[in-house]
Amino acid sequence: MRILWIVAVCLIGVEGNLYQFGKMIRYKTGKSALLSYSDYGCYCGWGGQGKPKDATDRCCFVHDCCYGRVNGCDPKLTIYSYSFENGDIVCGGDDSCKRAVCECDRVAAICFGENLNTYDKKYKNYPSSQCTETEQC
């Protein structure tokens, strides 16, 4: 039963916003979102706590805060309109909630791209037990 639940969650991610966010990350960084950012520092991945470990982790912290301000839809599942144009990510559509989610993802992907030099492999698979200090959005 647990395996079916995991497969269902993965399929939702493939169809929903997490897949779109991953495409934005790849576009701005050239890296796989799943392999490079899914479990990095204290904030990159599901959930988050503590103080961001570096500028890359801070991108995830700011992204989590941005998702926390979105009202009217589930940011992790919302499918939105966007395009890649001349090196930029452009959010589209008339739905304000979908557009807000897209903007959160766009800003985070740009942040990752601007902070590629701070990415430190020692923070990959970083233990959450080391994320003890607190920081507010």
UniProtKB/Swiss-Prot annotation:
GO terms for biological process: arachidonate secretion; lipid catabolic process; phospholipid metabolic process. It comes from the Eukaryota. InterPro entries: PLipase_A2 (IPR001211), PLipase_A2_Asp_AS (IPR033112), PLipase_A2_dom (IPR016090), PLipase_A2_dom_sf (IPR036444), PLipase_A2_His_AS (IPR033113). The keyword tRNA processing does not apply. GO terms for cellular component: extracellular region. Expressed by the venom gland. Ca(2+) binds at Y43, G45, G47, D64. It is found in: Secreted. Gene3D superfamilies: Phospholipase A2 domain. Binds 1 Ca(2+) ion. Residues 1-16 form the signal peptide. Its main location: secreted. GO terms for molecular function: calcium ion binding; calcium-dependent phospholipase A2 activity; phospholipid binding; toxin activity. Snake venom phospholipase A2 that causes internal bleeding, shows very strong anticoagulant activities and inhibits ADP-induced platelet aggregation. Shows very low cytotoxicity. Is not able (or very weakly) to suppress the acetylcholine (ACh)-evoked current mediated by alpha-7-similar nAChRs in L.stagnalis neurons (IC(50)>30 uM) and to compete with alpha-bungarotoxin for binding to muscle- and alpha-7 neuronal nAChR types, as well as to AChBPs. This is Acidic phospholipase A2 Vur-PL2B. It comes from Vipera renardi (Steppe viper). The lineage of its organism: Eukaryota, Metazoa, Chordata, Craniata, Vertebrata.
